[in-house]
């Protein structure tokens, strides 16, 4: 969609922010290629880094002082060095653009210590035409997916997962595939339920 807007003369200016930031932490003013999908680069008004888990952290004058009358929640979100932990996971390319990969609270942490972003796998599964919607989650200490597809498409979905697994590192491979013709359960906001 963004590429089409740019082709039709629209100028796209994207910002990454959240309620806990006054302003934004990342700014994307590029109008070209893959960078259109990026969250952006640090804007210079605050410091931005990724911690060891890949979580975006922001520090500076744009960060809130804390949650009103809730010091416990503040301490969980802002560390002793003043870094606000956003809960968003990202990767950074060689040009310094940040790309969202998922949410920290959704991470699947394997017994091996490896972290798997379900959103990353869901995006890959979304390339299968037979899949209407899906969710990836831990299922009995394995990575599994629940897929909404027509009954006659289940074999196509399972074949797609088999092929996808060949391209993934061993620890990211999907071991359990459950198919349902019924839409997957959602919360009141319309988001897929992970549990």
Protein language model regions, located:
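Short, conserved charged micro-motifs
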Residues: 152-159
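Conserved ATP-binding/catalytic segment of the ANL
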Residues: 42, 46-51, 55-110, 115, ...
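Gly/Ser/Thr-rich phosphate-binding loop
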Residues: 1-34
């Amino acid at each position: 969609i963004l590429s089409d807007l740019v082709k039709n003369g629209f100028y796209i200016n994207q910002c990454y922010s959240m309620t806990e930031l006054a302003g934004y932490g990342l700014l994307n003013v590029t109008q070209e290629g893959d960078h259109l999908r990026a969250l952006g680069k640090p804007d210079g008004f605050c410091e931005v880094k990724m911690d060891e888990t890949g979580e975006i952290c922001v520090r500076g004058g744009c960060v809130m002082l804390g949650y009103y009358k809730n010091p416990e929640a503040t301490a969980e979100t802002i560390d002793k060095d003043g870094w606000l932990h956003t809960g968003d996971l990202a990767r950074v390319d060689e040009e310094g653009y940040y790309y969202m990969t998922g949410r920290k609270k959704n991470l699947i942490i394997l017994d091996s210590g490896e972290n798997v972003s379900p959103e990353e796998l869901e995006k890959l599964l979304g390339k299968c035409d037979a899949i209407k919607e899906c969710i990836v989650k831990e299922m009995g200490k394995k990575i599994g997916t629940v897929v909404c597809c027509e009954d006659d498409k289940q074999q196509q979905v399972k074949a797609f997962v088999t092929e996808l697994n060949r391209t993934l590192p061993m620890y990211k491979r999907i071991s359990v595939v459950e198919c349902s013709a019924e839409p997957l359960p959602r919360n009141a906001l319309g988001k897929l339920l992970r549990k």
